[in-house]
Amino acid sequence: MASKILVNIKEEVTCPICLELLTEPLSLDCGHSFCQACITANHKESRERSCPLCRVSYHSENLRPNRHLANIAERLREVMLSPEEGQKVDRCARHGEKLLLFCQQHGNVICWLCERSEEHRGHRTSLVEEVAQKYREKLQAALEMMRQKEQDAEMLEADVREEQASWKIQIENDKTSTLAEFKQLRDILDCEESNELQKLEKEEENLLKRLVQSENDMVLQTQSIRVLIADLERRLQGSVMELLQGVEGVIKRIKNVTLQKPETFLNEKRRVFQAPDLKGMLQVFKELKEVQCYWAHVTLIPNHPSCTVISEDKREVRYQEQIHHHPSMEVKYFYGILGSPSITSGKHYWEVDVSNKSAWILGVCVSLKCIGNFPGIENYQPQNGYWVIGLRNADNYSAFQDAVPETENYQPKNRNRFTGLQNADNCSAFQNAFPGIQSYQPKKSHLFTGLQNLSNYNAFQNKVQYNYIDFQDDSLSTPSAPLIVPLFMTICPKRVGVFLDYEACTVSFFNVTSNGYLIYKFSNCQFSYPVFPYFSPMTCELPMTLCSPSS
């Protein structure tokens, strides 16, 4: 009986962590007690201040030393170390006999009197020495299994910690990205605000200048009328001779007096400011960031016309006027050079600084042949291997598209309405476009219908946004000239981004100065051969410079 009591007491003063008698016990708010060393080590490992048994949180300042449990544990140690008590442990608490048998049904050690009692009668029993090895092996296997489970639990714990760290890093990255995007948005807004204020200041300057001039004109007009009034008053108050002297001239002057009204400025004609589309601006900025991920290291190929100069690092080209001109160099389109490397696949992006230049052409070209053969303006077409945009006369931005077939010039805009026959078998209905035979158009009273290629009946409508013009001389017109597509810029680009997607067959141009807005995009490009970056400084001596990502 005494042994059973000791066992119960021992359970009460045993640390749940180390399973030994409590040493310097500390009690938590929940009532559980642990060794001071055990609870401290547990906190360092788990990094959580919670009870290992019930998981109730606690504060370290609330840990209380439990002297009562410490005294009980100390007394129990003394009893367990006593030789007499050690002998009692091996004896039956009920009968006082040695515990020599093991009951298979109850799984307990019993004495020979217990075996004969009603409680264990008919149960299968064995000597403790016989079953000890068997259960030792079972417990050893169980120990190995639990150690493996401990390792698995530690791995799961490590996985949770790793996932926690991963999420923390990901969220921190998202925070950084969000801050960067909003900073970029604020920079965009600051830039837009500055541009709008500059426009308003310029408008104010021009408007006030004109109003001041108008005020001066009105002052002069009032002064001239006052002079005339003073002359009339003097004549009326003077003698007859003074009244009649030159009176016809005075009357004529009076008849010629007409009040000039001041120049007026209608408020409704003023440009109304509209807040920028923030969502659209962010989308544009996102698209620019996406293509900038494909930044290519482009350099200029030294094989170039003598009228151009390339820097030593092969990243800058400029026009240099020559004293002795080659006859073919009189045409001002051929100062272009190619970039390296050649492109046969993938996505590639580069940026070109064109600050303060009054003329330039850039984009993509299919072959080096154009450099040696000095091509004409007609070559600036996708069908000839050029996908380019350019600037001329400081403010005319254009994209170069394929020339429209001549039959497309027969369009109804010229008031000529009739049916015509062309090349014996092509009859077509024509609508307005361009001069020459093209003048058979509605705007010139020519409208007609007919058959084309024996089976195709077509109506041709106007393409008012396009013109066949020479890049340097708008007065010239040629059927083979490229179709010039005007490009309208709210902010003139100082830096132009070029994005080539070889597999998608597209070439896109971005106004980096205007936060990455798309300038123009060529689609369905036929890249049959390797393509090269293309640059032409034209006759402007300011350089074109390839930019680096860091700039």
Curated annotation (Swiss-Prot):
Q: Where is this region: Required for interaction with GABARAP and for autophagy?
A: 182-195
- Residue(s) carrying Phosphoserine: S82
Zinc fingers (B box-type): which spans? 87-128
Binding of Zn(2+) occurs at: C92, H95, C114, H120
Q: What's a single GO BP term from this record?
A: positive regulation of canonical NF-kappaB signal transduction
Pathway listed for it is: Protein modification; protein ubiquitination
Q: Where are the zinc fingers (RING-type)?
A: 15-55
Q: What is its EC number?
A: 2.3.2.27
Please report the name of this protein according to its UniProt entry.
Tripartite motif-containing protein 5
Q: Which compartment or compartments is the protein found in? A: Cytoplasm; Nucleus
Query: Which family does the UniProt entry place this protein in?
Result: Belongs to the TRIM/RBCC family.
Give the main location: cytoplasm
Q: Name one GO molecular function term.
A: zinc ion binding
**PANTHER family per the UniProt record, alphabetical:** E3 UBIQUITIN-PROTEIN LIGASE TRIM
> Do the record's keywords include Cell membrane?
no
Q: Transmembrane helix: is it a keyword of this entry?
A: no
Entry PTM: Degraded in a proteasome-independent fashion in the absence of viral infection but in a proteasome-dependent fashion following exposure to restriction sensitive virus.
Organism's domain of life? Eukaryota
Look up and give the organism this protein is from. Answer: Alouatta sara
